[in-house]
């Protein structure tokens, strides 16, 4: 486990914008269709905004029509932690970066094959690293 989990709020406030802090560290949610990566289609990898851990490949991204970037699987097993979320009068499964505890969003069971899962992620919780062409 990374030492990122040991960082306090002052550390994260110095590294993140106010909106990123609200979403990543206080488990907020951005408005649907407002995030930077909702319509991104380029090839590459989505990293944790807080600690740069690779979380999702663009090949797993799909348009769920929900207003948030959606993926049918994480990059590899163990990079995402799941926890029951009973906030807002609902029962959902929260997803977080295993390395630093960054709130990413939620996972639902209405996704496409091959997994049937929809990892619904806030754009403010991730950053995109475009795949470099190898010549």
UniProtKB/Swiss-Prot annotation:
Protein name stated in the entry: Peptide methionine sulfoxide reductase MsrB
Keyword Oxidoreductase found: yes
Alphabetic keyword roster: Metal-binding, Oxidoreductase, Zinc
Pfam family, any one: SelR
Similarity remark: Belongs to the MsrB Met sulfoxide reductase family.
GO biological process, alphabetically ordered: protein repair; response to oxidative stress
Positions of the catalytic residues: 120 (nucleophile)
This protein's encoding gene: msrB
Enzyme class: oxidoreductase
Record has S-adenosyl-L-methionine as a keyword: no
Residues the record lists as binding Zn(2+): 48, 51, 97, 100
Disulfide bonds: none
């Amino acid at each position: 486990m990374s030492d990122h989990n040991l960082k306090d709020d002052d550390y994260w406030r110095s590294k993140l914008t106010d909106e990123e802090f609200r979403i990543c560290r206080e488990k907020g949610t951005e408005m649907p269709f407002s995030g930077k990566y909702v319509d991104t289609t380029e090839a590459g990898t989505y990293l944790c905004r807080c600690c740069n851990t690779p979380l999702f490949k663009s090949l797993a991204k799909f348009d769920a029509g929900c207003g948030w970037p959606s993926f049918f699987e994480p990059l590899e097993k163990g990079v995402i932690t799941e926890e029951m979320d009973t906030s807002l009068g609902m029962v959902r499964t929260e997803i977080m970066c295993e390395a630093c505890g960054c709130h990413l969003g939620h996972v639902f069971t209405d996704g496409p094959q091959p997994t049937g899962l929809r990892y619904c992620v806030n754009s403010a919780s991730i950053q995109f690293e475009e795949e470099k062409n190898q010549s």
